[in-house]
A protein has these predicted regions:
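Active-site loops and adjacent core secondary-structure elements that bind or stabilize anionic groups
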Residues: 153
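Signature of N-terminal electron-transfer/Fe-S-associated modules in redox systems
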Residues: 1-150
Length: 153
């Protein structure tokens, strides 16, 4: 066991973890932040995406110990539980960008990162290329792609 200290959703966290503990396991099992989903455990589906130091990262591929001092934002930290939705969450809701919801946390955090990086330079091709690492079996991506061109960008 080894200690790792990082910031998760704005709160300082120190946890004793096994050297093989993945970030997704730290979030879900140690911190009980279950909004980050595990779909494939092989970096294929994107359901486990969180923001690490502001960048989208598949949390099933990163060891918790690698994140010493990092700033991690999971879907639970994107907007206050008792406050308004984040603009990207609102865009998903308004544009029907979800059905079963399993991929939604990863899709939303990927979208937040993409809009931060590309902003008004987004076009349909770029959006589709950037979403290749996020699998949704329900929506067919059409509404998800449309929401990028809504009021979020």
């Amino acid at each position: 066991m080894a200690a790792v200290s990082l910031t998760v959703n704005g709160k300082s966290v120190t946890a004793d973890v096994d050297s093989r503990t993945l970030l997704v396991q730290l979030l879900r099992e140690h911190l009980r932040l279950t909004g980050t989903h595990v779909g494939c455990d092989t970096s294929q589906c994107g359901a486990c995406v969180v923001l690490v130091n502001g960048k989208a990262v598949k949390s099933c591929t990163v060891l918790a110990l690698q994140l010493e001092g990092a700033d991690v934002l999971s879907i639970e930290g994107l907007a206050p539980a008792d406050g308004p939705l984040h603009p990207m969450q609102e865009a998903f809701r308004e544009n029907h960008g979800l059905q079963c919801g399993y991929c939604t946390p990863g899709m939303i955090l990927t979208a937040v990162d993409l809009v931060r990086r590309k902003g008004h330079e987004l076009d349909d091709r770029t959006i589709r290329e950037e979403l290749e690492g996020n699998i949704c079996r329900c929506t067919g991506y059409h509404n998800i792609c449309l929401l990028y061109t809504s009021r979020c960008v």
